[in-house]
Amino acid sequence: MRPHSPALRKLLRLALVSPLCGLASFERRPQAPGLPAAPLTPMDRALPDWRGVVLRANRWSTQPFNPSYWSEPKLGPYGWSLRNAAIVDGELRLRVTEKASGQIQAWDRAFATRGLWEVDVTLPSMAPGLIAAPLWIYNRITLDESDFEVVGVKGLFVTLWTKVDGQHVAVWDNGGAPILSGDLSGRRLRLGMAYEAGRSVTYFVDGRPVARATPADAKGGHFPTGPQKAYLDLWVAAGLDPGWAGVWRPMREGQSLEMVVHGYRQA
């Protein structure tokens, strides 16, 4: 992951909240004094597409999304590649190729302690060992995290993480049960995640709430309390225990698997 910058550390100390409207509108809109906060519920209309969004590496202060291009232990030899994240005809396309995975992450201005994130996604052909994570939010300093993950051919799972005794620990996982079970190859889904730091996370599928976690539900009462931002990725769990996602079978040279994210919104 990208090293912590002084600007990011300052941002997190201030717990900056930057609601998004669509992809390219990142201005802050403070809540008027005395008014209740707007409800965090999915929108009925189509999500904004990716037209006008540019993916270039290392534009952390000027570009709303940046592609990843490094490796992590969980990936084994399938590190993030710039070639595996692209916007084509207004859609985000994330690919896995032999020995490479694809990821983008929001810039640091997108950190929020309260927000609703949504994606409209068509999943790839799923396979054992393949992880499709079309939407998750994370803070690499506080280790707060909330995930949607399609795990191999087992289904769609949700998990909540935070820092416990200095370690990144899963503190809630819907009892280990998938939200949607089985092989979800080619499924088109509208996923949403409403986060209120220290209070709750609600997960939506196709506009319906399907799971909710609060501190009372979390292991030891540990719960995310910091600002988080969005990540979207498709990757191979080659560096993890195959008992989780299954055993990945390497592809032939030139083969690829692709996840298409048609729209995205943070509000």
PLM regions and their residue ranges:
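N-terminal secretory signal peptides
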Residues: 1-21
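Short, aromatic/His-centered strand-loop micro-motif at the edge of beta-sheets
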Residues: 166-188
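Short, tryptophan-glycine- and acidic/Ser/Thr-enriched carbohydrate-recognition patches
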Residues: 48-81
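Short carbohydrate-recognition loop motifs
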Residues: 83-99
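Aromatic sugar-binding interfaces of carbohydrate-active proteins
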Residues: 200-259
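Localized edge beta-strand/strand-to-loop motifs within extracellular or lumenal beta-rich domains
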Residues: 187-201
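Extracellular/lumenal carbohydrate-interaction signature centered on repeated Trp-anchored short motifs
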Residues: 107-117, 179-187, 223
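Secretory/extracellular carbohydrate-interaction modules
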Residues: 94-159
